[in-house]
Swiss-Prot record:
Record family assignment: Belongs to the ParB family.
Species, as recorded: Chlamydia pneumoniae
Name of the protein: Probable chromosome-partitioning protein ParB
SMART domains xref list: ParB
One Pfam family per UniProt: HTH_ParB
GO CC terms: chromosome
Length: 286
């Protein structure tokens, strides 16, 4: 193996002699990003070489293991390069290299939330780090680390939806507010099928929570909710015009509450008299 020296070395190696670290957290690479990087490399060259270490048997180098820069290495492969400049880290131990790979990618690469969560988990379980220590090493708040780790409580199906970009981190946080795994799966499906925004997903989640335990056959789309809200506003206005007081209608699941805003007991007496004189509300509203 190369003798330890104080500085790293930039060398040119065969592109096929490089292997990805088993601790590389990134699993998804955008083809669009790779094509943009290829265009940049063809225009100005590879500005920041990947970082590698030697994997040896005795004095013979078997291959070079990536510590950082897999995306650049992949782009060079796709561009048809046969060799690539790399920064060689000298005499770096297995544990140090693995930890460095995880931390380097967390800090520098735009990881998917699931990739980030899995990277944090490996730092904790493989290297025995606490959440506080992980947060310190990667330059993030402890609460951020904890929130990412919570994503791993989601089912593999929902994790895959997040990994593939079908839902966002915001959507995943909303799904986590549901304790029932079946409701989580249902909300995930609705978000994907209806292309819901996070705020719309929150409304559906509240409805699912309120109706938990009952038979739920159909969930409203955002258009349904908008139309329902408009109907409530129209009914509120008609009731207000009839009785002379401000009326507010609130719905929660299949239940609804009608509130009359009164100033004093005299208003209450007048409202009682009005209700008595108008018979059923359905007759008054028709």
């Amino acid at each position: 193996m190369t003798e330890e020296i104080s500085k790293d070395t930039i060398i040119e190696v065969a592109i096929d002699d490089i292997r990805v670290s088993p601790f590389q957290p990134r699993r998804v690479f955008s083809n669009e990003e790779l094509q943009e990087l290829i265009a940049s490399i063809k225009a100005v060259g590879l500005i920041h070489p990947p970082v590698v270490r030697e994997i040896c048997t005795g004095d013979r180098v078997l291959y070079y293991e990536l510590i950082a820069g897999e995306r650049r290495w992949r782009a060079m492969q796709l561009a048809g390069a046969t060799t690539i400049p790399v920064i060689l880290k000298h005499v770096i131990a297995d544990g140090t290299a693995a930890e460095a790979t995880l931390i380097e990618n967390i800090q520098r690469v735009n990881l998917n939330p699931i990739e980030m969560a899995e990277a944090f988990k490996r730092l904790i379980h493989v290297f025995g780090l606490t959440q506080d220590k992980v947060a310190y090493k990667v330059g993030k708040k402890r609460s951020t680390v904890a929130n990412y780790l919570r994503l791993l409580a989601l089912s593999k199906t929902i994790q895959e939806s997040l990994l593939q970009g079908q839902i966002t981190l915001g959507h995943a946080k909303v799904i986590l507010t549901l304790e029932d795994p079946i409701l989580r799966e249902k909300l995930n499906e609705i978000i994907i099928q209806e292309h819901l925004a996070v705020r719309e997903a929150e409304l559906i989640a509240k409805q699912l929570i309120s109706e938990e335990g009952s038979s739920i056959e159909l969930k409203p789309t955002p258009l349904d909710m908008a139309e329902s809200s408009k109907q409530h506003e129209e009914l509120q206005q008609r009731l207000s015009d009839l009785c002379g007081y401000k009326v507010q209608i609130k719905t929660r699941g299949s239940k609804a509450t009608v509130s009359f805003h009164l100033q004093n007991t005299q208003d209450l007496q007048k409202l009682e008299a009005w209700l008595s004189s108008h018979g059923t509300l359905s007759e008054s509203l028709s």
